A protein has these predicted regions:
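Long, terminal "pre-/pro-" and other extracytoplasmic accessory regions
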Residues: 1-161
Length: 161
């Protein structure tokens, strides 16, 4: 049983390593590419994922009532997919004006993590509060932090095994 767990840990560790190693462009470069093409707006979701055998950054940008979803090739920086949708957010434009930045929310989650690696972040409304939903990988476990986008307070710290 211990051998199986050790083998599983080695496999999972190498998958996590290879995922990062395959991303030739940085997270910041991917965000810059999406924001440049969108000509403004707020990044509301970001993650590195594998799609059809290649690593892509998935980036969601909201500008007013327009939502743009990008897939950016993590090796070349090319936009391989763009979907645009008109959204009705009512009179609530606060999704465009969080007081805490994406990078600050990520920093808060990583600071409260034990040697974790960033996986995903999404800006959304949860029970009427604008929050960043941040996923961090910690070995065999994932942690999900809900961080108030206006105060930086951690509203939830959930562990998934």
């Amino acid at each position: 049983m211990k051998k199986i767990l050790i083998i599983g840990a080695i496999i999972l560790g190498s998958i996590g390593f290879s995922t990062s190693a395959l991303a030739a462009i940085s997270e910041q470069q991917a965000k810059d590419i999406a924001l440049k093409e969108a000509q403004g707006g707020q990044i509301t979701k970001f993650k590195l994922d594998k799609e059809k055998g290649r690593m892509v950054y998935e980036v969601e940008v909201i500008d007013g009532n327009i939502e743009k979803d990008y897939e950016i090739d993590a090796e070349t920086g090319a936009i391989v997919k763009l979907e645009q949708e008109q959204k009705n957010h009512g009179n609530n434009n606060s999704v465009n004006n969080p007081k805490i930045s994406y990078d600050k929310a990520k920093e808060i989650a990583l600071k409260n993590s034990k040697n974790g690696k960033f996986k995903e972040i999404e800006l959304k409304h949860k029970n009427g509060v604008l929050v960043y939903d941040v996923e961090i990988a910690e070995g065999f476990m994932d942690r999900e932090f809900l961080i108030d986008a206006n105060t930086g307070a951690i509203l939830r710290d959930k562990k998934d095994f």
